[in-house]
Amino acid sequence: MKTEKMDFDSLTAEQIGKLFPIRIVPYNPDWEMLFEREKVLITEVLDKDVTFGIEHFGSTSIVGLAAKPTIDTMVEVSKLSDELKQVITRKLETIGYGNMYNSENDSKMTFGKGYDENYACTQTYHVHIREKGDVPQDEIYFRDYLRDNVVACDEYAKLKYALAEKYQFNREEYTQAKTEFITKITELQKNKNR
């Protein structure tokens, strides 16, 4: 049975939460391989003159960490003109990605795949497109700290399980409730790098 890509632009946050509840799963050692495979696909469809770097970030990039089964990929590109946004959208659609909350005015874009009627048993993927020089280093600082600190990693896993239970159908509240912990860890890594 063929599945249709999800059109996130037509859904409210409440609808998204009900269709795709938060679920945290134990660490999967295949996540790194899945990222590498996705990186190859993305590199093949996006012009090498446009793409400056591709990073795996988010919880699936941290060995041993429980996570939503979503591979987050950061792609750094040249200036995001309207024309380039259209080209990127078209090219990512060829490998199954749908547009997620992208505004005409943003200097960033987000795409997703794996969101369909089989969501409960599907690996999902997000591609975060950022302009060169606008890559959010805080996400990399956070990732790097947790990669090196088992205690903080365990603490974060416990927090995520608790919040996923509390905010199972509200992705925005789930994300917001993690902010204090993420900010604290990010600052620790920044201070470590000084």
Report each predicted region and the residues it spans.
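Residues that flank catalytic or metal-binding motifs in active/ligand-binding sites
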Residues: 69-71, 123, 142
